Amino acid sequence: MTAVASTSGKQDADHNQSIECPRFSRGQKEILLDHEDAKGKDSIINSPVSGRQSISPTLSNATTTTTKSIMNATGTSGAVVSNTPEPGLKRVPAVTFSDLKQQQKQDSLTQLKNDSERTKSPNSNPAPVSNSIPGNHAVIPNHTNTSRTTQLSGSPLVNEMKDYDPKKKDSALKIVDTMKPDKIMATSTPISRENNKVTAKAPTSITLRKEDAQDQANNVSGQINVRSTPEETPVKQSVIPSIIPKRENSKNLDPRLPQDDGKLHVLFGATGSLSVFKIKPMIKKLEEIYGRDRISIQVILTQSATQFFEQRYTKKIIKSSEKLNKMSQYESTPATPVTPTPGQCNMAQVVELPPHIQLWTDQDEWDAWKQRTDPVLHIELRRWADILVVAPLTANTLSKIALGLCDNLLTSVIRAWNPSYPILLAPSMVSSTFNSMMTKKQLQTIKEEMSWVTVFKPSEKVMDINGDIGLGGMMDWNEIVNKIVMKLGGYPKNNEEEDDDEDEEEDDDEEEDTEDKNENNNDDDDDDDDDDDDDDDDDDDDDDDDEDEDEAETPGIIDKHQ
Protein backbone atom coordinates (compact mmCIF):
# COMPACT_ATOMS: atom_id res chain seq x y z
CA MET A 1 0.00 0.00 0.00
CA THR A 2 1.33 3.44 -0.77
CA ALA A 3 0.37 6.84 0.40
CA VAL A 4 1.16 9.82 -1.80
CA ALA A 5 1.18 13.34 -0.38
CA SER A 6 1.65 16.54 -2.38
CA THR A 7 1.42 20.21 -1.76
CA SER A 8 0.49 23.05 -4.08
CA GLY A 9 3.56 24.90 -5.39
CA LYS A 10 1.59 28.04 -6.08
CA GLN A 11 0.61 28.72 -2.51
CA ASP A 12 2.08 31.58 -0.58
CA ALA A 13 5.46 30.97 1.06
CA ASP A 14 4.11 32.23 4.37
CA HIS A 15 1.36 29.62 4.32
CA ASN A 16 2.13 26.85 6.77
CA GLN A 17 3.25 23.77 4.97
CA SER A 18 1.10 20.80 5.93
CA ILE A 19 1.08 17.10 5.22
CA GLU A 20 -1.32 15.84 2.64
CA CYS A 21 -3.84 13.27 3.74
CA PRO A 22 -2.48 9.86 2.79
CA ARG A 23 -4.40 8.06 0.16
CA PHE A 24 -5.16 4.51 1.16
CA SER A 25 -6.03 1.56 -1.01
CA ARG A 26 -6.75 -2.09 -0.27
CA GLY A 27 -5.06 -3.35 -3.38
CA GLN A 28 -1.70 -5.05 -3.42
CA LYS A 29 -0.27 -2.83 -6.18
CA GLU A 30 1.69 0.24 -5.22
CA ILE A 31 1.58 3.55 -7.11
CA LEU A 32 5.13 4.38 -7.97
CA LEU A 33 5.95 7.90 -9.02
CA ASP A 34 9.13 8.77 -10.79
CA HIS A 35 11.45 11.32 -9.23
CA GLU A 36 11.46 13.43 -12.38
CA ASP A 37 7.66 13.49 -12.70
CA ALA A 38 7.36 14.46 -9.06
CA LYS A 39 9.40 17.65 -9.41
CA GLY A 40 7.81 20.56 -7.62
CA LYS A 41 6.32 18.18 -5.10
CA ASP A 42 7.49 18.40 -1.54
CA SER A 43 7.53 14.76 -0.47
CA ILE A 44 6.53 11.26 -1.38
CA ILE A 45 5.69 9.04 1.54
CA ASN A 46 6.29 5.26 1.67
CA SER A 47 7.83 5.18 -1.82
CA PRO A 48 9.92 2.04 -2.49
CA VAL A 49 12.34 4.00 -4.68
CA SER A 50 15.42 5.18 -2.82
CA GLY A 51 16.37 8.81 -2.84
CA ARG A 52 12.86 10.14 -2.29
CA GLN A 53 12.04 12.90 0.13
CA SER A 54 9.51 12.76 2.94
CA ILE A 55 8.10 15.20 5.39
CA SER A 56 7.97 14.19 9.01
CA PRO A 57 4.33 14.01 10.10
CA THR A 58 4.40 16.68 12.75
CA LEU A 59 2.05 19.51 13.54
CA SER A 60 4.60 22.23 12.74
CA ASN A 61 6.82 23.11 9.79
CA ALA A 62 9.51 20.55 9.03
CA THR A 63 12.39 20.37 6.66
CA THR A 64 12.92 17.58 4.20
CA THR A 65 15.57 14.99 4.85
CA THR A 66 17.00 12.24 2.77
CA THR A 67 15.28 8.95 3.55
CA LYS A 68 15.78 5.30 2.78
CA SER A 69 13.05 2.72 2.60
CA ILE A 70 13.34 -0.73 4.07
CA MET A 71 11.54 -3.94 3.10
CA ASN A 72 9.64 -5.97 5.62
CA ALA A 73 9.27 -9.74 5.78
CA THR A 74 6.22 -9.80 3.44
CA GLY A 75 8.06 -8.11 0.61
CA THR A 76 6.12 -4.89 0.78
CA SER A 77 7.64 -1.58 1.61
CA GLY A 78 7.84 -0.70 5.25
CA ALA A 79 8.00 2.57 7.08
CA VAL A 80 10.28 5.37 6.06
CA VAL A 81 13.19 5.63 8.41
CA SER A 82 16.03 8.04 8.75
CA ASN A 83 19.48 7.07 7.51
CA THR A 84 21.18 9.32 10.00
CA PRO A 85 20.78 7.97 13.55
CA GLU A 86 20.02 10.31 16.34
CA PRO A 87 22.99 11.32 18.51
CA GLY A 88 23.66 8.92 21.34
CA LEU A 89 21.85 5.97 19.71
CA LYS A 90 23.23 2.82 18.13
CA ARG A 91 23.17 2.61 14.35
CA VAL A 92 19.84 0.83 14.17
CA PRO A 93 17.05 2.08 11.89
CA ALA A 94 14.45 3.83 14.02
CA VAL A 95 11.24 5.66 13.24
CA THR A 96 11.49 9.32 14.16
CA PHE A 97 8.82 11.87 14.85
CA SER A 98 11.28 14.67 15.49
CA ASP A 99 11.13 18.27 14.56
CA LEU A 100 14.37 20.11 14.08
CA LYS A 101 13.08 23.12 15.94
CA GLN A 102 12.16 20.94 18.87
CA GLN A 103 15.09 18.57 18.54
CA GLN A 104 16.34 19.00 22.07
CA LYS A 105 12.91 18.29 23.48
CA GLN A 106 12.31 15.25 21.26
CA ASP A 107 15.66 13.44 21.77
CA SER A 108 14.69 11.78 25.00
CA LEU A 109 11.26 10.88 23.66
CA THR A 110 12.72 9.20 20.59
CA GLN A 111 15.01 7.07 22.73
CA LEU A 112 12.08 6.09 24.93
CA LYS A 113 10.10 4.97 21.91
CA ASN A 114 13.00 2.93 20.50
CA ASP A 115 13.52 1.23 23.84
CA SER A 116 9.84 0.33 23.98
CA GLU A 117 10.03 -1.27 20.54
CA ARG A 118 13.09 -3.30 21.54
CA THR A 119 11.27 -4.45 24.68
CA LYS A 120 8.34 -5.56 22.59
CA SER A 121 10.45 -7.78 20.29
CA PRO A 122 13.91 -8.27 21.82
CA ASN A 123 15.00 -10.98 19.33
CA SER A 124 14.14 -9.18 16.14
CA ASN A 125 14.67 -5.83 14.50
CA PRO A 126 12.27 -3.07 15.46
CA ALA A 127 9.07 -3.40 13.50
CA PRO A 128 8.29 -0.40 11.32
CA VAL A 129 5.46 1.78 12.49
CA SER A 130 2.65 2.06 10.04
CA ASN A 131 0.18 4.91 10.02
CA SER A 132 -2.35 2.98 8.00
CA ILE A 133 -5.97 3.21 9.03
CA PRO A 134 -7.86 -0.09 8.99
CA GLY A 135 -11.34 -0.24 7.58
CA ASN A 136 -12.87 2.03 4.96
CA HIS A 137 -10.73 4.97 3.91
CA ALA A 138 -11.80 8.41 2.83
CA VAL A 139 -11.29 9.18 -0.84
CA ILE A 140 -10.61 12.83 -1.68
CA PRO A 141 -11.88 13.94 -5.11
CA ASN A 142 -9.31 15.55 -7.36
CA HIS A 143 -10.63 19.10 -7.85
CA THR A 144 -8.58 21.77 -9.47
CA ASN A 145 -7.61 24.88 -7.62
CA THR A 146 -8.38 23.13 -4.40
CA SER A 147 -5.75 22.64 -1.78
CA ARG A 148 -6.07 19.08 -0.64
CA THR A 149 -4.33 19.03 2.65
CA THR A 150 -4.63 16.95 5.71
CA GLN A 151 -4.10 18.40 9.08
CA LEU A 152 -2.95 15.38 11.12
CA SER A 153 -4.19 15.50 14.65
CA GLY A 154 -1.85 13.78 16.98
CA SER A 155 -2.85 10.67 18.79
CA PRO A 156 -2.94 10.75 22.60
CA LEU A 157 0.65 9.56 22.57
CA VAL A 158 1.74 12.40 20.26
CA ASN A 159 -0.14 14.96 22.32
CA GLU A 160 1.65 13.79 25.41
CA MET A 161 4.97 13.88 23.57
CA LYS A 162 4.57 17.56 22.90
CA ASP A 163 4.24 18.34 26.57
CA TYR A 164 7.07 16.04 27.56
CA ASP A 165 9.86 17.59 29.58
CA PRO A 166 12.81 15.26 30.32
CA LYS A 167 13.55 17.13 33.55
CA LYS A 168 10.14 16.40 35.03
CA LYS A 169 9.28 12.96 36.34
CA ASP A 170 5.56 13.60 36.20
CA SER A 171 5.65 14.11 32.45
CA ALA A 172 7.43 10.79 32.00
CA LEU A 173 4.82 9.03 34.09
CA LYS A 174 2.10 10.67 32.04
CA ILE A 175 3.61 9.34 28.82
CA VAL A 176 3.95 5.83 30.20
CA ASP A 177 0.33 5.97 31.32
CA THR A 178 -0.70 7.17 27.86
CA MET A 179 1.08 4.27 26.19
CA LYS A 180 -1.11 1.70 27.93
CA PRO A 181 -3.13 -0.45 25.53
CA ASP A 182 -6.49 0.91 26.62
CA LYS A 183 -5.42 4.49 25.83
CA ILE A 184 -3.10 4.05 22.87
CA MET A 185 -5.57 2.22 20.62
CA ALA A 186 -8.29 4.19 18.85
CA THR A 187 -11.62 2.58 18.03
CA SER A 188 -12.74 4.99 15.35
CA THR A 189 -11.25 7.42 12.83
CA PRO A 190 -13.54 10.39 12.47
CA ILE A 191 -12.94 12.53 9.40
CA SER A 192 -14.35 16.04 9.12
CA ARG A 193 -14.24 18.47 6.20
CA GLU A 194 -14.13 22.17 6.86
CA ASN A 195 -13.24 24.75 4.20
CA ASN A 196 -11.99 22.08 1.80
CA LYS A 197 -9.57 20.84 4.41
CA VAL A 198 -9.69 17.30 5.62
CA THR A 199 -8.77 16.78 9.21
CA ALA A 200 -8.18 13.11 10.04
CA LYS A 201 -7.56 11.82 13.50
CA ALA A 202 -5.19 9.03 12.67
CA PRO A 203 -4.48 6.51 15.39
CA THR A 204 -1.17 4.84 15.79
CA SER A 205 -0.91 1.12 15.23
CA ILE A 206 1.39 0.45 18.13
CA THR A 207 -0.16 -2.36 20.17
CA LEU A 208 1.17 -3.29 23.53
CA ARG A 209 0.12 -6.08 25.78
CA LYS A 210 -0.24 -5.50 29.48
CA GLU A 211 2.93 -7.48 30.13
CA ASP A 212 4.89 -5.47 27.55
CA ALA A 213 3.59 -2.18 28.92
CA GLN A 214 4.68 -3.17 32.39
CA ASP A 215 8.11 -4.26 31.12
CA GLN A 216 8.44 -1.03 29.16
CA ALA A 217 7.73 1.05 32.23
CA ASN A 218 10.20 -0.93 34.34
CA ASN A 219 13.04 -1.38 31.83
CA VAL A 220 13.65 2.29 30.88
CA SER A 221 16.93 3.25 32.53
CA GLY A 222 19.39 6.08 31.98
CA GLN A 223 16.90 8.11 29.96
CA ILE A 224 14.01 8.97 32.21
CA ASN A 225 13.49 8.23 35.86
CA VAL A 226 10.27 6.25 35.73
CA ARG A 227 8.82 5.08 39.01
CA SER A 228 7.81 1.49 38.41
CA THR A 229 5.21 -0.27 40.45
CA PRO A 230 7.00 -2.04 43.31
CA GLU A 231 6.61 -5.77 43.27
CA GLU A 232 4.91 -7.35 46.20
CA THR A 233 7.36 -8.91 48.59
CA PRO A 234 6.56 -12.63 48.86
CA VAL A 235 5.42 -13.50 52.33
CA LYS A 236 7.64 -16.17 53.81
CA GLN A 237 5.52 -18.70 55.55
CA SER A 238 6.92 -19.63 58.88
CA VAL A 239 7.63 -23.32 58.75
CA ILE A 240 6.61 -24.92 61.98
CA PRO A 241 9.02 -27.72 62.83
CA SER A 242 7.22 -31.00 62.85
CA ILE A 243 7.23 -32.74 66.24
CA ILE A 244 7.60 -36.46 65.58
CA PRO A 245 5.75 -38.36 68.30
CA LYS A 246 7.15 -41.45 69.82
CA ARG A 247 4.25 -43.42 68.41
CA GLU A 248 2.36 -43.09 65.17
CA ASN A 249 -0.78 -41.64 66.73
CA SER A 250 -1.34 -40.56 70.30
CA LYS A 251 -5.13 -40.77 70.05
CA ASN A 252 -6.59 -43.11 72.63
CA LEU A 253 -9.13 -45.38 70.99
CA ASP A 254 -9.20 -47.99 73.75
CA PRO A 255 -8.94 -47.05 77.44
CA ARG A 256 -7.02 -50.27 78.07
CA LEU A 257 -4.32 -49.12 75.64
CA PRO A 258 -3.34 -45.57 76.67
CA GLN A 259 -1.01 -43.96 74.15
CA ASP A 260 0.04 -40.87 76.10
CA ASP A 261 0.72 -42.11 79.62
CA GLY A 262 4.46 -41.34 79.41
CA LYS A 263 5.55 -44.93 80.14
CA LEU A 264 7.56 -47.58 78.34
CA HIS A 265 5.21 -50.07 76.72
CA VAL A 266 6.41 -53.68 76.62
CA LEU A 267 4.24 -56.26 74.88
CA PHE A 268 4.92 -59.93 75.64
CA GLY A 269 3.80 -62.77 73.41
CA ALA A 270 3.67 -66.28 74.85
CA THR A 271 3.21 -69.46 72.81
CA GLY A 272 2.54 -73.08 73.81
CA SER A 273 5.73 -74.28 75.44
CA LEU A 274 6.75 -75.41 78.92
CA SER A 275 8.81 -72.24 79.24
CA VAL A 276 5.61 -70.17 79.15
CA PHE A 277 5.60 -70.13 82.94
CA LYS A 278 8.75 -67.97 82.89
CA ILE A 279 6.63 -65.03 81.78
CA LYS A 280 5.73 -64.19 85.36
CA PRO A 281 9.29 -63.72 86.74
CA MET A 282 10.28 -61.68 83.68
CA ILE A 283 7.41 -59.25 84.24
CA LYS A 284 8.24 -58.99 87.92
CA LYS A 285 11.92 -58.29 87.18
CA LEU A 286 11.13 -55.53 84.68
CA GLU A 287 8.82 -53.81 87.13
CA GLU A 288 11.54 -53.95 89.77
CA ILE A 289 14.02 -52.31 87.38
CA TYR A 290 11.81 -49.51 86.08
CA GLY A 291 8.98 -49.29 88.58
CA ARG A 292 5.29 -49.38 87.83
CA ASP A 293 5.18 -45.65 87.22
CA ARG A 294 7.68 -45.90 84.35
CA ILE A 295 6.75 -49.12 82.55
CA SER A 296 3.52 -50.73 81.36
CA ILE A 297 3.40 -54.42 80.40
CA GLN A 298 0.73 -56.38 78.55
CA VAL A 299 0.66 -60.02 77.44
CA ILE A 300 -0.77 -61.84 74.41
CA LEU A 301 -1.43 -65.56 74.88
CA THR A 302 -1.98 -68.01 72.06
CA GLN A 303 -4.51 -70.80 72.37
CA SER A 304 -1.78 -73.33 73.18
CA ALA A 305 -0.33 -71.07 75.87
CA THR A 306 -3.71 -70.77 77.58
CA GLN A 307 -3.95 -74.56 77.62
CA PHE A 308 -0.75 -74.77 79.67
CA PHE A 309 -2.00 -72.22 82.21
CA GLU A 310 -5.44 -73.79 82.45
CA GLN A 311 -4.05 -77.25 83.07
CA ARG A 312 -1.82 -75.99 85.83
CA TYR A 313 -4.66 -74.05 87.36
CA THR A 314 -6.94 -77.09 87.20
CA LYS A 315 -4.36 -79.26 88.95
CA LYS A 316 -4.09 -76.73 91.75
CA ILE A 317 -7.85 -76.67 92.18
CA ILE A 318 -8.00 -80.45 92.25
CA LYS A 319 -5.28 -80.64 94.87
CA SER A 320 -7.04 -78.08 97.01
CA SER A 321 -10.31 -79.99 96.72
CA GLU A 322 -8.61 -83.22 97.74
CA LYS A 323 -7.31 -81.51 100.83
CA LEU A 324 -10.81 -80.37 101.61
CA ASN A 325 -12.06 -83.91 101.24
CA LYS A 326 -9.45 -85.22 103.63
CA MET A 327 -10.39 -82.58 106.13
CA SER A 328 -14.10 -83.32 105.72
CA GLN A 329 -13.69 -87.03 106.40
CA TYR A 330 -13.97 -86.23 110.06
CA GLU A 331 -17.28 -84.55 109.38
CA SER A 332 -20.65 -86.14 108.63
CA THR A 333 -21.06 -84.89 105.05
CA PRO A 334 -18.10 -85.10 102.63
CA ALA A 335 -17.31 -82.06 100.51
CA THR A 336 -17.91 -82.31 96.79
CA PRO A 337 -14.83 -81.47 94.67
CA VAL A 338 -15.14 -78.43 92.46
CA THR A 339 -13.50 -78.63 89.02
CA PRO A 340 -13.65 -75.23 87.30
CA THR A 341 -14.07 -74.96 83.57
CA PRO A 342 -12.15 -72.42 81.46
CA GLY A 343 -15.31 -70.42 80.90
CA GLN A 344 -16.08 -70.11 84.56
CA CYS A 345 -12.67 -68.78 85.70
CA ASN A 346 -11.02 -65.48 84.86
CA MET A 347 -7.90 -65.70 82.69
CA ALA A 348 -5.99 -63.38 85.02
CA GLN A 349 -6.65 -65.80 87.85
CA VAL A 350 -5.56 -68.71 85.69
CA VAL A 351 -2.26 -67.14 84.66
CA GLU A 352 -1.72 -65.81 88.20
CA LEU A 353 -0.37 -62.44 87.12
CA PRO A 354 -0.89 -59.17 89.00
CA PRO A 355 -4.29 -57.60 88.32
CA HIS A 356 -2.79 -54.51 86.62
CA ILE A 357 -1.27 -56.69 83.85
CA GLN A 358 -3.61 -56.81 80.86
CA LEU A 359 -3.98 -60.19 79.15
CA TRP A 360 -5.18 -60.67 75.57
CA THR A 361 -6.40 -63.80 73.80
CA ASP A 362 -7.74 -64.56 70.34
CA GLN A 363 -11.31 -64.16 71.50
CA ASP A 364 -10.65 -60.56 72.58
CA GLU A 365 -10.06 -59.64 68.94
CA TRP A 366 -13.73 -60.33 68.18
CA ASP A 367 -15.10 -59.07 71.46
CA ALA A 368 -13.54 -55.62 70.91
CA TRP A 369 -14.85 -55.30 67.35
CA LYS A 370 -18.61 -55.20 66.83
CA GLN A 371 -19.11 -52.80 63.93
CA ARG A 372 -17.15 -51.14 61.18
CA THR A 373 -16.23 -48.05 63.17
CA ASP A 374 -14.83 -49.98 66.14
CA PRO A 375 -11.03 -50.18 66.54
CA VAL A 376 -9.22 -53.36 65.55
CA LEU A 377 -7.36 -54.88 68.48
CA HIS A 378 -4.18 -56.06 66.76
CA ILE A 379 -3.76 -52.63 65.13
CA GLU A 380 -4.20 -50.87 68.47
CA LEU A 381 -1.69 -53.20 70.13
CA ARG A 382 0.78 -52.46 67.36
CA ARG A 383 0.32 -48.71 67.94
CA TRP A 384 0.62 -49.07 71.70
CA ALA A 385 3.78 -51.20 72.01
CA ASP A 386 7.36 -49.93 72.01
CA ILE A 387 8.83 -53.43 71.87
CA LEU A 388 7.47 -56.94 71.29
CA VAL A 389 9.04 -59.91 73.06
CA VAL A 390 7.89 -63.38 72.02
CA ALA A 391 9.13 -65.72 74.74
CA PRO A 392 8.82 -68.61 74.41
CA LEU A 393 8.61 -69.05 70.62
CA THR A 394 7.50 -72.42 69.29
CA ALA A 395 8.36 -73.92 65.91
CA ASN A 396 4.76 -73.40 64.78
CA THR A 397 4.79 -69.65 65.43
CA LEU A 398 8.29 -69.37 63.94
CA SER A 399 7.02 -70.87 60.69
CA LYS A 400 4.07 -68.46 60.64
CA ILE A 401 6.36 -65.45 61.13
CA ALA A 402 8.70 -66.57 58.34
CA LEU A 403 5.83 -67.20 55.91
CA GLY A 404 3.78 -64.16 56.92
CA LEU A 405 0.76 -66.04 58.23
CA CYS A 406 -1.57 -64.23 60.60
CA ASP A 407 -4.24 -66.60 61.87
CA ASN A 408 -4.30 -65.45 65.50
CA LEU A 409 -3.90 -62.26 67.51
CA LEU A 410 -0.14 -62.57 68.04
CA THR A 411 0.78 -63.29 64.42
CA SER A 412 -1.58 -60.52 63.28
CA VAL A 413 0.31 -58.02 65.44
CA ILE A 414 3.64 -59.26 64.05
CA ARG A 415 2.39 -59.04 60.46
CA ALA A 416 1.17 -55.44 60.95
CA TRP A 417 4.22 -54.39 63.01
CA ASN A 418 6.01 -51.09 62.45
CA PRO A 419 9.64 -51.85 61.44
CA SER A 420 10.82 -48.82 63.41
CA TYR A 421 10.33 -50.75 66.65
CA PRO A 422 12.18 -53.95 67.62
CA ILE A 423 10.90 -57.51 67.97
CA LEU A 424 12.75 -60.05 70.13
CA LEU A 425 12.24 -63.81 69.62
CA ALA A 426 13.33 -66.45 72.14
CA PRO A 427 12.89 -69.90 70.57
CA SER A 428 11.95 -72.86 72.73
CA MET A 429 11.64 -76.25 71.03
CA VAL A 430 13.05 -79.73 70.97
CA SER A 431 16.66 -80.00 69.87
CA SER A 432 15.84 -82.08 66.81
CA THR A 433 13.23 -79.53 65.74
CA PHE A 434 15.59 -76.59 66.16
CA ASN A 435 18.38 -78.34 64.20
CA SER A 436 16.14 -79.28 61.26
CA MET A 437 16.76 -77.81 57.80
CA MET A 438 13.35 -76.18 57.73
CA THR A 439 14.01 -74.28 60.96
CA LYS A 440 17.41 -73.10 59.70
CA LYS A 441 15.86 -71.91 56.46
CA GLN A 442 13.15 -69.99 58.31
CA LEU A 443 15.67 -68.39 60.66
CA GLN A 444 17.78 -67.36 57.67
CA THR A 445 14.73 -65.80 56.01
CA ILE A 446 13.94 -63.77 59.11
CA LYS A 447 17.56 -62.64 59.42
CA GLU A 448 17.83 -61.47 55.80
CA GLU A 449 14.39 -59.95 55.26
CA MET A 450 13.38 -58.69 58.72
CA SER A 451 16.13 -56.49 60.08
CA TRP A 452 13.96 -55.31 62.99
CA VAL A 453 13.63 -58.88 64.35
CA THR A 454 16.28 -60.31 66.69
CA VAL A 455 16.36 -64.06 67.34
CA PHE A 456 18.08 -65.16 70.56
CA LYS A 457 20.31 -68.19 70.59
CA PRO A 458 18.73 -71.03 72.57
CA SER A 459 20.49 -72.72 75.45
CA GLU A 460 21.51 -76.32 76.04
CA LYS A 461 19.37 -78.17 78.54
CA VAL A 462 17.47 -81.36 79.15
CA MET A 463 14.72 -81.27 76.56
CA ASP A 464 12.59 -84.38 77.14
CA ILE A 465 11.73 -87.07 79.64
CA ASN A 466 14.47 -89.31 78.30
CA GLY A 467 17.10 -87.00 79.71
CA ASP A 468 18.56 -85.98 76.37
CA ILE A 469 20.55 -82.75 76.47
CA GLY A 470 20.40 -80.63 73.37
CA LEU A 471 20.32 -77.13 71.93
CA GLY A 472 16.83 -75.71 71.73
CA GLY A 473 15.74 -74.56 75.15
CA MET A 474 14.71 -70.96 75.76
CA MET A 475 17.41 -68.55 76.86
CA ASP A 476 17.58 -67.91 80.57
CA TRP A 477 14.90 -65.40 81.51
CA ASN A 478 17.42 -63.15 83.32
CA GLU A 479 19.39 -62.76 80.10
CA ILE A 480 16.18 -62.02 78.21
CA VAL A 481 15.32 -59.27 80.70
CA ASN A 482 18.82 -57.85 80.31
CA LYS A 483 18.47 -57.68 76.51
CA ILE A 484 15.06 -56.04 76.82
CA VAL A 485 16.51 -53.36 79.10
CA MET A 486 19.39 -52.72 76.71
CA LYS A 487 16.98 -52.36 73.78
CA LEU A 488 14.99 -49.83 75.78
CA GLY A 489 18.07 -47.69 76.41
CA GLY A 490 19.85 -49.27 79.35
CA TYR A 491 19.31 -49.56 83.06
CA PRO A 492 17.86 -46.44 84.67
CA LYS A 493 19.60 -44.76 87.59
CA ASN A 494 17.48 -44.40 90.69
CA ASN A 495 17.77 -41.40 92.97
CA GLU A 496 18.82 -43.62 95.88
CA GLU A 497 21.64 -45.12 93.88
CA GLU A 498 22.80 -41.67 92.83
CA ASP A 499 22.73 -40.54 96.47
CA ASP A 500 24.72 -43.61 97.49
CA ASP A 501 27.26 -42.91 94.77
CA GLU A 502 27.60 -39.33 95.96
CA ASP A 503 28.03 -40.46 99.57
CA GLU A 504 30.71 -42.94 98.52
CA GLU A 505 32.53 -40.24 96.59
CA GLU A 506 32.38 -37.92 99.60
CA ASP A 507 33.72 -40.67 101.87
CA ASP A 508 36.55 -41.33 99.45
CA ASP A 509 37.40 -37.63 99.37
CA GLU A 510 37.41 -37.45 103.17
CA GLU A 511 39.69 -40.49 103.41
CA GLU A 512 42.09 -38.94 100.92
CA ASP A 513 42.10 -35.70 102.90
CA THR A 514 42.86 -37.52 106.16
CA GLU A 515 45.65 -39.48 104.50
CA ASP A 516 47.17 -36.27 103.16
CA LYS A 517 46.99 -34.70 106.61
CA ASN A 518 48.66 -37.72 108.20
CA GLU A 519 51.44 -37.64 105.66
CA ASN A 520 51.98 -33.94 106.29
CA ASN A 521 52.16 -34.56 110.05
CA ASN A 522 54.68 -37.34 109.55
CA ASP A 523 56.80 -35.05 107.41
CA ASP A 524 56.72 -32.38 110.13
CA ASP A 525 57.85 -34.91 112.76
CA ASP A 526 60.72 -36.00 110.57
CA ASP A 527 61.78 -32.40 110.10
CA ASP A 528 61.74 -31.84 113.87
CA ASP A 529 63.92 -34.89 114.41
CA ASP A 530 66.37 -33.67 111.81
CA ASP A 531 66.52 -30.27 113.50
CA ASP A 532 67.24 -31.89 116.86
CA ASP A 533 70.06 -33.93 115.35
CA ASP A 534 71.53 -30.82 113.81
CA ASP A 535 71.41 -29.04 117.18
CA ASP A 536 73.22 -31.94 118.83
CA ASP A 537 75.90 -31.87 116.19
CA ASP A 538 76.37 -28.14 116.71
CA ASP A 539 76.75 -28.67 120.46
CA ASP A 540 79.41 -31.30 119.89
CA ASP A 541 81.33 -29.00 117.61
CA ASP A 542 81.22 -26.24 120.21
CA ASP A 543 82.60 -28.58 122.85
CA ASP A 544 85.48 -29.58 120.62
CA ASP A 545 86.34 -25.97 119.96
CA ASP A 546 86.40 -25.22 123.68
CA GLU A 547 88.76 -28.12 124.35
CA ASP A 548 91.13 -26.94 121.65
CA GLU A 549 91.26 -23.49 123.13
CA ASP A 550 92.03 -24.88 126.58
CA GLU A 551 94.87 -26.96 125.24
CA ALA A 552 96.37 -23.95 123.50
CA GLU A 553 96.35 -22.00 126.75
CA THR A 554 98.11 -24.82 128.73
CA PRO A 555 101.02 -26.12 126.65
CA GLY A 556 102.33 -28.23 129.45
CA ILE A 557 99.34 -30.39 129.30
CA ILE A 558 99.85 -30.86 125.62
CA ASP A 559 103.41 -31.96 126.21
CA LYS A 560 102.32 -34.43 128.80
CA HIS A 561 99.90 -35.95 126.36
CA GLN A 562 102.53 -36.19 123.78
From Swiss-Prot:
Compositional bias per record (Acidic residues), positions renumbered to this chain: 496-553
Polar residues bias: start-end ranges: 1-10, 44-63, 99-113, 142-156
UniProt-listed InterPro entries: Flavin_trans-like, Flavoprotein
Gene Ontology MF term list: catalytic activity; FMN binding; identical protein binding; protein serine/threonine phosphatase inhibitor activity
Segments for region (Disordered): 1-63, 97-165, 490-562
Protein keywords: Coenzyme A biosynthesis, Cytoplasm, Nucleus, Phosphoprotein, Protein phosphatase inhibitor
Regions of compositional bias (Low complexity) in chain numbering: 121-134
Ranges that cross the membrane: none
Entries under Gene3D superfamilies matching the protein: Flavin prenyltransferase-like (3.40.50.1950)
Cellular component GO terms, alphabetical: chromatin; CoA-synthesizing protein complex; nucleus; phosphopantothenoylcysteine decarboxylase complex
Pfam families (UniProt xref): Flavoprotein
GO biological process per UniProt: coenzyme A biosynthetic process; regulation of mitotic cell cycle; response to salt stress
Biased composition (Basic and acidic residues): 27-42
Location within or outside the cell: Nucleus; Cytoplasm
Subunit structure: Interacts with the C-terminal domain of PPZ1. Component of the phosphopantothenoylcysteine decarboxylase (PPCDC) complex, a heterotrimer composed of CAB3, SIS2 and VHS3.
Homology family: Belongs to the HFCD (homooligomeric flavin containing Cys decarboxylase) superfamily.
Described purpose of this protein according to its UniProt entry: Component of the phosphopantothenoylcysteine decarboxylase (PPCDC) involved in the coenzyme A synthesis. Acts as an inhibitory subunit of protein phosphatase PPZ1, which is involved in many cellular processes such as G1-S transition or salt tolerance. Also modulates the expression of the ENA1 ATPase.
Further details from the record: Present with 3750 molecules/cell in log phase SD medium.
Record's protein name: Phosphopantothenoylcysteine decarboxylase subunit SIS2
Source taxonomy: Eukaryota, Fungi, Dikarya, Ascomycota, Saccharomycotina
